[in-house]
UniProtKB/Swiss-Prot annotation:
Enzyme class name: transferase
Keywords linked to the UniProt accession: ATP-binding, Cytoplasm, Fatty acid biosynthesis, Fatty acid metabolism, Lipid biosynthesis, Lipid metabolism, Nucleotide-binding, Transferase
Keyword Ribosomal protein: no
Function comment: Component of the acetyl coenzyme A carboxylase (ACC) complex. First, biotin carboxylase catalyzes the carboxylation of biotin on its carrier protein (BCCP) and then the CO(2) group is transferred by the carboxyltransferase to acetyl-CoA to form malonyl-CoA.
SUBUNIT field: Acetyl-CoA carboxylase is a heterohexamer composed of biotin carboxyl carrier protein (AccB), biotin carboxylase (AccC) and two subunits each of ACCase subunit alpha (AccA) and ACCase subunit beta (AccD).
Catalytic activity: N(6)-carboxybiotinyl-L-lysyl-[protein] + acetyl-CoA = N(6)-biotinyl-L-lysyl-[protein] + malonyl-CoA
Family: Belongs to the AccA family.
Pathway: Lipid metabolism; malonyl-CoA biosynthesis; malonyl-CoA from acetyl-CoA: step 1/1
EC number annotated for this UniProt entry: 2.1.3.15
Protein name per UniProt: Acetyl-coenzyme A carboxylase carboxyl transferase subunit alpha
Transmembrane segments: none
Length: 317
């Protein structure tokens, strides 16, 4: 059984009936229920298509936050070989919210940075729900510097509600760490590819997403502030997050139209959590195509194109 979202209730009811009938048929050794099971499966598939054909921005936000979506470490495990993680910022500590290291993608050595939310209570606490502290961004800068030094393409996976806003993080220079990470992205003379796999929240996301090629999963979101945060500022009422989401143009489709991103990666019907391997492989195909398109571009041109790309975003929005 999946973790169903509120708006998926019709599908949840039908799939619940299907499971009950399958269990009953197995217990009784009966094949007479197969026609009814097939009928319900068709109704369930049709209901899912109908719901996902007309998703609202707020519903997409809920899908982007779905606890069962594939996370950064799952992408790393499936797409890369010989992954060697690097830990620590050489200044204070290691931040598990940001996963960094080196590996091989289709045999090519690459640098990898990704935000990991965790998949259960224990790992979510370990990874601080994907909200990085200053030491996480300083660790990311370490990897960027090494990628530049050894001329390795950089691939980043973005999935965060935002950088950690706690007092301790502010005391250790959270704003400076985010700014330095963003600036380092702009300085690199290697191909940089960023994929937003869930939430892309505020400076915590942009700090590792200033890339030559930026892609979003079909039901991911990308914004300067969460819908709840925007609602709190605009209307002093966080419960109006649904209204805020509708106004903010935070979906992959909106941001592609605005030329903020370079493309949208399709998800299986029902979201990435219903077909993890398929969506990770689709992301891998995009990475392959992006690396191929940049392989003959010199480092200075890559740097200047990246800077120009983000200057244009600032001018046009």
């Amino acid at each position: 059984m999946y973790n169903y979202l509120d708006f998926e209730k019709p599908v949840a009811d039908l799939e619940g009936q299907i499971l009950e009938l399958k269990k009953l048929a197995q217990e009784q050794g009966s094949v007479e229920m197969s026609d009814e099971i097939r009928r319900l499966e068709k109704r369930s598939a049709d209901a899912l298509k109908d719901i996902y054909r007309k998703l609202t921005p707020w519903q997409k936000t809920q899908i982007a936050r779905h606890p069962d979506r594939p996370h950064c470490l799952e992408y790393i495990d499936r797409l890369f070989t010989e992954f060697t993680p690097l830990a620590g910022d050489r200044k204070f500590a290691n931040d598990e919210a940001l996963q960094t290291g080196f590996g091989r993608f289709n045999g090519q050595a690459v640098a990898i940075i990704g935000q990991e939310k965790g998949s259960d209570t224990k790992t979510r606490l370990k990874h601080n729900f994907g909200s990085a502290r200053p030491e996480g961004y300083r660790k990311a800068v370490r990897i960027m510097e090494m990628a530049d030094r050894f001329q390795l393409p950089l691939i980043t996976f973005v999935d965060t509600a935002g950088a950690y806003p706690g007092v301790s993080a502010e005391e250790r220079g959270q704003a400076e760490a985010i700014a330095r990470s963003t600036a380092e992205c702009l300085r690199l003379r290697v191909p940089v590819i960023s994929i937003i796999i869930g939430e892309g929240g505020s400076g915590g996301a942009i700090a590792i997403a200033v890339a030559n090629r930026v892609y979003m999963l079909e039901h991911s979101i990308y914004s300067v502030i969460s819908p709840e945060g925007a609602a709190s500022i605009l209307w002093h009422d966080s419960t109006r997050a649904k209204d805020a989401a509708s106004s903010m143009r935070i979906t992959a489709q909106d941001l592609f139209d605005l030329k903020v991103i370079d493309g949208v990666i399709p998800e299986p019907m029902g979201g990435a959590h219903r077909g993890k391997e398929a969506v990770i492989d689709a992301a891998g195909d995009i990475i392959t195509a992006s690396l191929r398109s940049m392989k003959d571009i010199d480092g200075e041109t890559l740097k200047q194109e990246r800077r120009q790309k983000f200057l244009e975003i600032g001018r046009n929005i």
